[in-house]
Curated annotation (Swiss-Prot):
This is Cytochrome b. The gene is cob. GO terms for biological process: mitochondrial electron transport, ubiquinol to cytochrome c. Its cofactor is heme b. It comes from Phytophthora megasperma. It is a multi-pass membrane protein.
Amino acid sequence: MRWNKKSLFAVLNNHLIDYPTPINLNYFFGFGSLAGIMLVVQILTGIFLAMHYTPHIDLAFNSVEHIMRDVNNGWLMRYTHANGASFFFIVVYVHIFRGLYYGSYITPREALWCSGVIIFILMMATAFMGYVLPWGQMSFWGATVITNLFSAIPLIGKDIVDWLWGGFAVDNPTLNRFFSLHFTFPFVIVGAVLIHLILLHEVGSNNPLGITLKTENIPFYPYFYTKDLFGLMVLFLVFFIFIFYYPNTLGHPDNYIEANPMKTPLHIVPEWYFLPFYAILRSIPNKIGGVIAMFGSLIVLLTIPFTNSSEIRSTAFRPIFKVCYWLLVVAFLLLGWVGQCPVEYPYTEIGIISMIYYFFFFIIIIPFLGKFETYLVRYNTNK
């Protein structure tokens, strides 16, 4: 068609319609598209909520109640945004673990993987600041605990905390700057996502076999468009069930109590999607050690493309690694469970064991298991 030859439409046509896609992609490869759609949902609902939200410690909690009670369909906007964050992270976690399983970090996709990890870190920062905005008990005390972690940095830690707070405690300046950053970061994420897509289309999509065969590609539209559309319908079905029937299931009841600096909640826990990393933080009794471990658990994801020694992409053809991979999934789920439990026996011990395996997988298994597998293959070939 003539409009396809125009510069703008040509770009859209090349990246959304005629984009060559491996013919054997399964439904797990559609979670990247679902993540993009959830990002759009979050931005749109966030803009509408920002129209009625007041970033002031005396008014923030009441402004959220005003949205829920007085604004037309405000309850729908708020529940969509709150539950949308959870579903956004669900989709992204599946996307990450799919990438780990099918070796989407192996050459030539190193930059693609690293850009995805950066997007994930930006998401976590955005979600944390958004959790502070309702100014409930968990909002206030979560902000206090997490920002205090920077005080573990030698010499300049206390100054960094005061700078983050805008004073000597979590107060009105903190809430204002968190609101500003929470509103700004999604657009930074959009920019990072565009870079992610450019890198993806530069090297092409991976596939379950991990073998690049350009002769086995078909256009994205209409084949994978309809496949992703089906995945979106299933996702939205579950999403709407939570919005309309269980809107508060994924939240914390203490956040319906207005922030009180004079009363500490019995258990201070973040949102569920932070729990695995929160468990890593708590598993080390030393403060600076816990902070290093928590941030290290994210930074280690950036090292995977450069420490990997396997010549085979897909875990389907790596039986030993497959066992290690599923043990990682179990360890990650255990960390998420332990993160919401009290700091006592046996939760502390389970958290420590799971944390050790988490780092063991990325620091030992990925760099050395590939070499061992290559040795076994060549030994049996030469036998």
